[in-house]
């Protein structure tokens, strides 16, 4: 079905609006994936706060012009499924990576984060970013370990000092 000019403008506006508020983006090729699996992927994307859409490459190129995702233009070849992470930078990459494990025909083309292009082979960099809660938990664990270690060292120094005074 051919799209009219107004439809194309609406698609470009919708995708560029999604790109403006996004933290990261990932592009993939979903040729050969069944409709049922794609529906499940779309549902998972909604739950994860990821905007996902299949868009014509020319329209997608126009939509990302002037955004942090302009560096992805070279991967917009063939059918392109684009996903923008709105809540967490690694959400779309994690979602696509998990989906690709169970679907041989699904292939990740690449991603972008803060204006930097991430090739498909390195998408794990983006997928393994900790969530805000995970990062805070790691920080707190590190702080607790550091303070416990400091306490142990202080107590050991105090013990050594008392032993030196007693001798």
Curated annotation (Swiss-Prot):
It comes from the Bacteria. GO terms for biological process: translation. GO terms for cellular component: large ribosomal subunit. It holds the Pfam family Ribosomal_L10. Keywords: Ribonucleoprotein, Ribosomal protein, RNA-binding, rRNA-binding. GO terms for molecular function: large ribosomal subunit rRNA binding; structural constituent of ribosome. PANTHER family: 39S RIBOSOMAL PROTEIN L10, MITOCHONDRIAL. Part of the ribosomal stalk of the 50S ribosomal subunit. The N-terminus interacts with L11 and the large rRNA to form the base of the stalk. The C-terminus forms an elongated spine to which L12 dimers bind in a sequential fashion forming a multimeric L10(L12)X complex. NCBIfam families: PRK00099.1-1 (NF000955). Forms part of the ribosomal stalk, playing a central role in the interaction of the ribosome with GTP-bound translation factors. Belongs to the universal ribosomal protein uL10 family. This is Large ribosomal subunit protein uL10.
């Amino acid at each position: 079905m051919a799209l009219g000019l107004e439809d194309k403008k609406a698609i470009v506006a919708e995708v560029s609006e999604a790109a403006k508020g996004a933290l990261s983006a990932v592009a993939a090729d979903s040729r050969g994936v069944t409709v049922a699996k794609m529906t499940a992927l779309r549902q998972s994307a909604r739950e994860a706060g990821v905007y996902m859409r299949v868009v014509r490459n020319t329209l997608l190129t126009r939509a990302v012009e002037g955004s942090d995702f302009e560096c992805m233009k070279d991967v917009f070849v063939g059918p392109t499924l684009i996903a923008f992470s709105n809540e967490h930078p690694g959400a779309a990459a994690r979602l696509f990576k998990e989906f690709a494990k169970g679907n041989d025909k699904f292939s990740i083309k690449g991603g972008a984060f803060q204006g930097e292009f991430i090739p498909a082979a390195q998408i794990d960099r983006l997928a393994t970013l900790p969530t805000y809660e995970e990062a805070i938990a790691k920080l707190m664990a590190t702080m607790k370990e550091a303070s416990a270690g400091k306490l142990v060292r202080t107590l050991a120094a105090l013990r050594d000092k008392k032993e030196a005074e007693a001798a």
